Design a protein with these regions (language model features):
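Chalcogenol-based redox active-site neighborhoods
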Residues: 1-115
């Protein structure tokens, strides 16, 4: 399990970043945010009933993270299309200000010791 300050494993994942279908997805890697701290959090699956509460709470803290030179990244093993559909379905997730990573191969989750 990684601790604060440990080197993040290399990764390249598709992320859902916008509700506009023309700007909805982008690729994010371990070097996408040079000079920034990365805060990663994961949830078990999209469309679960408790997870939106925690996701919204992280979103509400995102301004504080940015003030601290940190970038917030959330994710699960669902694909980017499921992330977007969940955001459309659940109004509380419509305006998230951080990328939702899609780790469908479970590589980053495994490297981080989450799975």
């Amino acid at each position: 399990m990684l601790k604060v300050g440990d080197k993040l494993p290399e990764f390249k994942l598709t992320a859902t970043v916008d509700m506009d279908i023309n700007k909805a997805f982008t690729e994010i890697t371990h070097v996408s945010y040079p000079g920034k701290w990365l805060i990663l959090f994961f949830w078990p699956k999209d469309f679960t009933f408790v997870c939106p509460t925690e996701i919204v709470a992280f979103n509400e803290l995102n301004g504080k993270f940015k003030e601290s030179n940190a970038v917030l990244l959330g994710g699960s093993t669902d694909n980017e299309f499921v992330h977007r559909a969940w955001r459309q379905y659940n109004k509380d997730l419509n305006d998230l200000s951080f990328p939702m990573l899609s780790d469908i191969k479970r590589e980053l989750c495994s490297d981080l010791g989450i799975l």
